[in-house]
Design a protein with these regions (language model features):
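Acyltransferase
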Residues: 2, 245-247, 273-299, 345, ...
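Structural helix-boundary/capping segments
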Residues: 14, 145-262, 267, 282-290, ...
């Protein structure tokens, strides 16, 4: 499985259509896969995810790997430990393939960071996530293109939901504290959550059974660390078994509200929803009713009040729910503390704290790109200057306690009490109004489309994460006019997460709405093997492979010479070697195999980032013996890995 995923990355991600979703590879992936093979052959599997390949966003700490969060300032920052979710997956035997692309510090969506950005596997003319908030763009592309079985993304505004919608994925944004965010780079601690990406609800449930667990360490997980708002333990809100949840029939008798503003039925606010999205919504609404749910159109005060989008509305400050100065304390004092604390906890002597960072390199604008269109935008380089003047511990930040309590009160008043008053079990709506053009970073006309309400950020904007409202997004269908997917989002009361998962699962199972990305079809020469189930005694000599490759430039072509040495007793049943996903013929002499491949030289010249060199060719080798033992290796030649 690891070999198959890496081959797809080599073929579609680094070269070919160059999706650029997985810029960093785990050098130990084959070692970890071999250990999983041994466990499973010998009846010692660590769980259902043992051996399953996955990706994680570049903001997750993976011990020994860099944790740049897409920023040139942190390109060489080394993680000293695993993030909580990475540790849970490692303990369950899952195999990390690599880290996925993102804009610097997740402070945006499709802006280009140190590794560039990911592209759409569905339509090259459109963005793989919302431009202003879709920072888990690499996770969305990688999961949709089957570069791994699932991906770990994040969300602060809509960075998990938007790429899920644009890639026909399932995304779960949990209630506060349900999934520990310890070990993830913070952006805005009051909003940040882990967001898993999967290709189906059953896959999501398998994953949640592993990563939803109590974490006794609260450092780096703001909501679990703060003392003013009591949160339930993960074990108190999760079911005994996610995979044991009954999905069929979950929608029966449910009363669901669809906000008029998201289906083109609100005359007071102009969210321009694409006609093909509305067509898919009509089909989804009909299916929800066939599943015996009652779907009613509603106004949506939680968003209208938060954004003051119409006359007569009052936001949290207007109503005295949060202090006037809370927003500044939240975006300055709290973020400076959180970024600094992350670096101090990471303990890399090269960048020990925020004051030691080169602020100008945190989020530099790539040459030739348009400026962002955020209101009240600022340069995050200022965080460094403030850190130099002193970092306020979060317990001493003025107005923070009152602000947090106000966020909770706002959710109860504007959303949960409103749900009760309307006799609603949940709300449901198209995840986005439209999809931005791919050239929105350089074309003014495209930018105007990409920055419209409902397109710049997934529907709901900041409300869901700021107020701690859980959501589950599932595929709603593929737009007939542009071939891009769009999701359907279910949202409900805080800690009603399990019911939302069941509702989404019931909808998903009623019809096939997910389309495979047409730009990344199945490759003809697969590297999966028929599994040999015989157990192997512990004293059996290990199978090892040593892979070497050299590149010689010759005009418009590069010649790659490959050498593979196999060590271990047994009879080989299969030796498969690929260069950039294409098979090459190997000649055997004893335990050594040799071969050559010719690739276009321009493949080693393509720029994916203004801050890095060009990608090299990926050479992969997978060997399987007659007794079932297998080993693999990869290396990169002709450029960076």
């Amino acid at each position: 499985m690891v070999g198959a995923c890496l081959r797809r990355i080599a073929h579609y991600d680094r070269h070919g259509i160059a999706l650029n979703a997985v810029p960093l590879l785990n050098p130990k992936m084959f070692e970890e896969a071999a250990a999983s093979d041994w466990r499973r052959r010998n009846g010692a599997a660590l769980g259902p995810l043992d051996g399953i390949p996955y990706t994680a966003k570049d903001s997750y700490k993976v011990s020994g790997l860099t944790v740049a969060a897409g920023s040139p300032a942190f390109e060489h920052l080394i993680a000293n430990e695993d993030a909580f979710t990475i540790g849970r997956l490692r303990a369950g035997g899952a195999v990390l393939i690599g880290l996925t692309n993102m804009p610097p510090m997740a402070n945006g969506g499709m802006q280009r960071g140190v590794y560039g950005r990911a592209e759409s596997p569905y339509n090259a003319d459109y963005l793989t996530a919302a431009f202003a908030s879709g920072s888990s763009n690499g996770s969305g592309t990688a999961t949709a293109a089957s570069f791994a079985a699932f991906g770990l993304g994040e969300e602060t505004w809509s960075s998990g939901r938007a790429p899920a919608s644009n890639n026909a994925l399932v995304a779960y944004t949990p209630s506060r504290g349900v999934i520990s965010v310890r070990g993830n780079w913070p952006l805005v601690p009051t909003m940040d959550v882990v967001v898993p990406h999967t290709r189906s609800v059953p896959d999501m449930l398998e994953l949640l059974d592993v990563i939803v667990a109590d974490d006794p360490n609260t450092r780096g997980d703001f909501w679990r660390a703060q003392p003013w708002v009591a949160l339930p333990k993960s074990s108190d809100v999760r079911p005994p078994s996610y995979t044991g949840l009954e999905l069929e029939g979950a929608l029966r008798g449910m009363r669901l509200g669809v906000p008029r503003m998201y289906i083109g039925r609100d005359t007071d606010i102009a969210i321009q929803t694409r006609a093909s999205v509305l067509e898919l919504w009509q089909q989804a609404a009909a299916d929800l009713r066939r599943l015996a749910a009652d779907v009613v159109e509603v106004d949506f005060p939680v968003v209208s009040n938060y954004e003051r989008d119409r006359p007569g509305t009052k936001n949290m400050v207007d109503r005295g729910l949060i202090p006037k100065g809370f927003a500044e304390r939240e975006i300055w004092d709290l973020c400076v503390f959180a970024w600094d604390d992350f670096l101090r906890a990471n303990a890399d002597p090269a960048i020990p704290d925020l004051a030691s960072v080169d602020g100008a390199k945190i989020f530099p604008q790539p040459p030739g790109t348009l400026p962002d269109r955020y209101e009240d935008s600022f340069d995050v380089a200022e965080y460094v200057e403030r850190a130099k003047r002193g970092v306020t511990p979060f317990l001493a930040i003025p107005e923070l306690e009152a602000g947090l309590k106000g966020l909770e009160a706002t959710r109860r008043i504007d959303f949960e009490d409103w749900l009760d008053a309307q006799r609603l079990d949940a709300v449901v709506f198209p995840a986005v109004a439209d999809v931005g053009p791919a050239d929105a970073d350089v074309n003014e006309a495209s930018a105007a489309l990409a920055w419209r309400n409902g397109t710049w950020v997934a529907n709901g904007n900041l409300v869901w994460r700021h107020l701690g409202i859980p959501t589950v997004t599932v595929p709603m269908g593929t737009m007939a006019d542009i071939g891009m997917p769009v999701g359907l989002t279910f949202a409900g009361k805080a800690y009603d997460d399990t019911r939302l998962l069941r509702l989404a699962g019931d909808f998903e199972r009623f019809g096939q709405r997910r389309s495979r990305p047409p730009r990344t079809p199945e490759l003809p020469d697969d590297v999966f093997f028929a599994r040999h189930n015989a157990s192997m005694p512990g004293e059996t000599p290990p199978l090892t492979v040593a892979l070497a490759a050299e590149t010689r430039h010759a005009g418009d072509q590069d010649e790659i010479t490959v050498t593979l040495d196999v060590a271990g007793t047994g009879i080989e049943t299969s030796v498969k070697v690929h260069v950039n996903g294409e098979p090459i013929r190997m000649q055997r002499t004893g335990a050594r195999f040799t071969g050559r491949a010719v690739v276009p030289a321009k493949g080693h010249e393509r720029i994916h980032s203004v801050w890095r060199g060009v990608y090299g060719s990926i050479v992969t080798a997978v060997v399987r013996l007659e007794d079932g033992r297998a080993a693999g290796a990869y290396m990169v030649t002709g450029g960076i890995g």
